[in-house]
Amino acid sequence: MKSLQKGFTLIELMIVVAIIGILAAFAIPAYNDYIARSQAAEGLTLADGLKVRISDHLESGECKGDANPASGSLGNDDKGKYALATIDGDYNKDAKTADEKNGCKVVITYGQGTAGEKISKLIVGKKLVLDQFVNGSYKYNEGETDLELKFIPNAVKN
């Protein structure tokens, strides 16, 4: 009486393991880039939150306000989970049209948020510097930013 074999041969199993290994070799770096991009996007959210503070400070003719909390000021920075956004720059009173820089900047430093060591190694310690325009929009400053271009949110690239 013949016995029927059921299951996979060793060669078939080795081929499946090799295919999974090849797929993982491509998927893991792509996933790491995805995580870094999503963490870098938090910086833009923090910068948007600082727009109101910058507008308030501009009424007194400066980008940065009094950083003394006792005076009722909200301060010049905002801390998120992965980044710290800080208002910087000197107000340009001559800027009038919407496409001119008003002199104010937001410096976003990754790795100084509340998450501590849980930030992607691809962006930790990097800076994204955003110039603010008269109309309130931001554009990244190519000369002062050391964050890789692929991690900079598209909203500030144009």
UniProtKB/Swiss-Prot annotation:
Positions of modified residues (N-methylphenylalanine): 8
Mode of membrane association: Single-pass membrane protein
Main location: other
Cystine connections: 63-104
PROSITE patterns documented for this protein: PROKAR_NTER_METHYL (PS00409)
Propeptide: 1-7
Gene Ontology cellular-component terms listed: membrane; pilus
Keyword Oxidoreductase: no
InterPro entries associated with the record: N_methyl_site (IPR012902), Pilin (IPR001082), Pilin-like (IPR045584), T4P/T2SS_Core (IPR050470)
Keywords assigned: Disulfide bond, Fimbrium, Membrane, Methylation, Transmembrane, Transmembrane helix
Disulfide bond in keyword set: yes
GO biological process terms held by the UniProt record: cell adhesion
Locations listed in the record: Fimbrium; Membrane
Protein family according to the UniProt entry: Belongs to the N-Me-Phe pilin family.
Its job: Major component of the type IV fimbriae that plays an essential role in twitching motility, natural transformation, and protease secretion.
Self-association and partners: The pili are polar flexible filaments of about 5.4 nanometers diameter and 2.5 micrometers average length; they consist of only a single polypeptide chain arranged in a helical configuration of five subunits per turn in the assembled pilus.
Protein name according to UniProt: Type IV major fimbrial protein FimA
Gene that this polypeptide is encoded by: fimA
